[in-house]
Design a protein with these regions (language model features):
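Intrinsic low-complexity, intrinsically disordered segments enriched in polar/basic residues
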Residues: 1-3, 31, 68, 80-81
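Generic structural concept
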Residues: 8-11, 34-38, 67, 71-74, ...
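Amphipathic alpha-helical interaction surfaces
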Residues: 16, 20, 39, 43-47, ...
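Amphipathic alpha-helical binding modules
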Residues: 17, 55-81
């Protein structure tokens, strides 16, 4: 079962990191954000991850798609809050 707290926590964390990521011009900062998000999703509720990932195992873990993924994750979480 996905709890309201887990949704709100994920939303807050991902929303904050996305805002920094999309405005950052520093590659090292973007890489650090990707690592932090990767670590976060490894530990988050599997059920919640599946709900926002559309079944993609590499969601929020693929460097080439990360910018799009983080935006989609925040949008999907906004819809279920």
């Amino acid at each position: 079962m996905i709890t309201k707290d887990s949704i709100e926590t994920a939303y807050s964390f991902l929303h904050q990191k996305r805002n920094v990521y999309i405005h950052s011009t520093l590659d090292w900062q973007k890489d650090d954000i990707e690592l932090a998000i990767g670590s976060y999703v490894d530990d988050m509720s599997q059920e919640l991850y599946e709900a926002i990932s559309d079944g993609r195992a590499d969601f929020l873990r693929d460097h080439k798609r990360f910018g799009d993924d983080i935006t989609q994750a925040v949008e999907r979480l906004e819809k279920i809050i």
